[in-house]
């Protein structure tokens, strides 16, 4: 079996060339499929497909994010007392791609280190009164009471999330090019102004991903630019994005990002 990024890229290119919304996996030759892959069998049966006798529709899906909050190998960030572990973190252990099961090992190693550091930090810091916590919560709630209007219903949120998913999958998915990314960037600007405040953080993250993909004019690891199909040795670095006090997204390049511990 080829690595996931190669399989996903092949499927995405097939869908792009044919205009179909999936590729087809023929597993009918595998004996006792339901015993070897019970979860897949159950999922297929829920949509009326018998994988023992019928082809299975497949398409790439977002699975793992190689980037994330910049941390060191102990889960520490540049925010004092804030630790990040797992898929939300960028430790640098994966590079531009990820080998299968590496994320599990990363979580076990870094996750095993964080508790001792957190306890050590708590022992050297003072306590916060319950009154101070409740007061901060009330102030924050009052400051954002108009962020979620009465019309912000579960149906509306599902509709907004679906629109965002379709845009990101279609334009910023497995295969990318400048035209698709620029179109996505423009639409994300509009969505940020029109979607409910509840979606703002998600849209901001989508904007950062899109901007990062536009700036990286090469193909490297899990990032595939159809208009730049080869790696560029001059771009062997990472980009660190942040939200400035002016509300704008800023970025800087560095070879091996590490948090500025304080």
Can you annotate each of these PLM segments?
Residues 1-56, 108, 117-123, 127:
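An anion/pyrophosphate-binding glycine-rich loop and adjacent beta-alpha core
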Residues 11-14, 64, 70-84, 88-262:
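Glycine- and aromatic-enriched mobile tails/lids
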Residues 38-83:
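FAD/FMN-dependent oxidoreductases across multiple families
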